[in-house]
Swiss-Prot record:
Pfam families: PEX18_PEX21_C. It comes from Eremothecium gossypii (strain ATCC 10895 / CBS 109.51 / FGSC 9923 / NRRL Y-1056) (Yeast). Coiled coil: none annotated. Interacts with PEX7. GO terms for biological process: protein transport. This is Peroxisomal protein PEX21. Belongs to the peroxin-21 family. One of its GO terms (cellular component) is cytosol.
Amino acid sequence: MSLCQGSAMQKLIAKTEGPMAGVGRVGGFNRPSGGLGQSSAEQQLQARAGERASQNRFMAVLEPQRELGGRMARGDGLQADWVRQFSSMQVEDPLAFSAEYQRAYAGYEQRQAARPAARVLGYGGSMFMPTMPQQQLQQQVAPQQTAQAALQEAELERYLEREFDVLEGELAPPEVPEALSAPLLDHEQLGFQESAKAIYATLSAPIHKDKFGASKFMGLMRQVSTGDVTLSKSESGYTGLHMTAGGEAVGAEYRAVTDEVVQVPEVAAALPLAGEERSLASQMEDLLNKVDIAGLSSNEAAMRILS
């Protein structure tokens, strides 16, 4: 046995004696001064357990876990205290709305939330809204609807006016320039036009319509009466017909015929006139009955009748 290691008798004596330097397995240590209660076996065991724990690796790992658990428990308590403090805080924002405005807005949200439920139950929802705000809303909406309706009506009128102008332009007859009418016709051409008007009016009567209605002669007389066709004037006289607008020749050139005096039958001359002159239509009817235009072209027939 070495000198550094104490015997069992020495350890027992050390427990009962006063303060003295003891020798242990690890090394010497100073015992605290005091009575028997302070140097009891329990305190020595705790001291030795602490020394062993400091030298044991596994005990060193368990101690931080115990400390962490204690810290977490203390942290939960602190967090609960922080939540209670935060919820009890009252922040005074200088830019916040007034309490009166917030109450009014809360009432507005309640009314808006009640509207869909009222429609589902079959109500219009007007009972949930006060009378004055609804009247003000109607007064504000009515002028807007009136202005919008007036604008739509004005746009519709402008559109219809443009469409009517286009239709009138398509349906209107082409305008004949004034330079192509009477001022370009001389005395003979104007007389020929007036005679053609009388002939066309006479042959358009129901009594002659079946006979001359579909003839080319009637078409020519109509064109002459409207001024679309007139006599062609040359150095040798009037030798044909042409279009007034373009100068194109109409029909074939007619041959000059000798003037013939048509003898009116005595029976026709002896008809009673009742003191009045016979109308031009009656005279033309008698003339057409006596003039033979068979085998003649439309131009020749016109010249034969008008000569």
